[in-house]
Amino acid sequence: MEGFSRDLLCGIGKGGDGPRGEVRPRVDMEAEEVELNLGLSLGGRFGLDRRGEKLARSSSVAAILAAPTEPSAPPSGLFRTSSLPTVAAAEAAKKQGVDELNCRRPSGGAEAEPAAARLPASGSPSSGSSDGEGRRLEVNMTDTLMRTSSLPAGIEDEWRKRKEAQSLKRLEVKRKRIERRNSLTSNISKEAVGQILEEMNAGAEKVESCDDVATGNKKTGGNVNHSSDRNRCTGLPPVHRATYTQQRGSLSGIPTKHIPAMKGSADAEEHNVPSAATEHRNGAAIATPPFSALAVRAVALASRGEQLRATGRVAARAKSMGDVERIMMQEMPCVCTKGLPNGKRVEGFLYKYRKGEEVRIVCVCHGSFLTPAEFVKHAGGGDVANPLRHIVVNPIPPSLY
């Protein structure tokens, strides 16, 4: 082998067993030969004349080398090209490699280097080409192509910035939603507190007006109980009155509360009215409810709402029970006996009275299932010829419609 591998595919394109350097004359055959070479993949010349000059197969295997047998001109076959774009520098290196190969051929191929140590100018290891006799063209690689990317270098930074902007936008929207919900809740609570304060102020004004009337009656010598009766007629709730007395130049923090009852005795009313007059004379009366009244009123409103909801549930349940009772009365109406000799009356309800079924009556007193004759007999009427004449169906009450 002399250190060179043998090209086993070199003779497929030629199709003969003759010596390598012998050129056999081309024989035109009427029948078209089977195309076995790779002319289609190598860009073969196929036009109107399909039996024209065929192209020699070029090997793309870099490990196949053949020793040149005789010096000859450079091969005239077409070289295998690469799909990568070629540059001017690669073309210049290719021409230089052809010149070097022409200079080395007379030496008998002793200076041939392994294919693994050389790369073609096109940048592909399979871009070397050889003719049908196994000659291979080798060129030195002078310039290399830079590896390119399908995405620009700064696209990752843009994506990261876009994701950060989206996350910030989501956080802003969430914060605004929470603030809006909190503001709605606070507005509702403020409105409720304001309404409670307005009601309390209105009640305090009414109490002050009643106290002024009572004081005027006391000064003019009128009947004091008349003002208390008027205060009772207004239907106002018990008023919490806190009085502060000046002792030793400072205000004492012990309030005195007077709560007149709606239905009290005359002695209690006479005891409370002079104390109120004394407060007005001293000028230290303050007709403002205590601070805890606000919390008490809020709790009362909450309990009232709960009672209303419970009442609504009870009403709905009663309505549903009324519907069930009405349906039961329509399906199983009540009956009773009438016109019996002993005058006894027994009540029951129809259990079966549909067409094709035997009528059954359930006795209320015992819960027995009886026929009409047995029901009349159970009432003490005995055996009668037509028991249905002694049984009356009670009408459904109008409240169940």
Curated annotation (Swiss-Prot):
Region feature Disordered, mapped onto this chain: 95-135, 215-238
Highest taxon in the source lineage: Eukaryota
Ranges of Low complexity composition bias in the record: 105-130
InterPro entries with a match to the protein in the record: Ninja_fam, Ninja_motif, NLS_NINJA_AFP-like, TDBD
Keywords, sorted A to Z: Nucleus
Induction record: Induced by abscisic acid (ABA) and drought stress.
Disulfide cross-links: none
Deleted gene: phenotype: No visible phenotype under normal growth conditions, but mutant plants exhibit increased abscisic acid (ABA) sensitivity and drought resistance.
Biological process, per Gene Ontology: negative regulation of DNA-templated transcription; signal transduction
Pfam families (UniProt xref): EAR, NLS_NINJA_AFP, TDBD
Subcellular localization, as worded in the UniProt entry: Nucleus
UniProt feature, compositional bias: Polar residues: 217-226
Record GO cellular component, one term: nucleus
Family the entry assigns: Belongs to the Ninja family.
Subunit annotation: Interacts with BZIP46, TPR3 and PUB70.
Function recorded in the entry: Acts as a negative regulator of abscisic acid (ABA) signaling and drought tolerance. Mediates deactivation and degradation of BZIP46, a positive regulator of ABA signaling and drought stress tolerance. Represses BZIP46 activity via interaction with the TPR3-HDAC1 corepressor complex and down-regulation of the histone acetylation level at BZIP46 target genes. Promotes BZIP46 degradation via interaction with the U-box type ubiquitin E3 ligase PUB70.
Name listed for the protein in its UniProt record: Ninja-family protein MODD
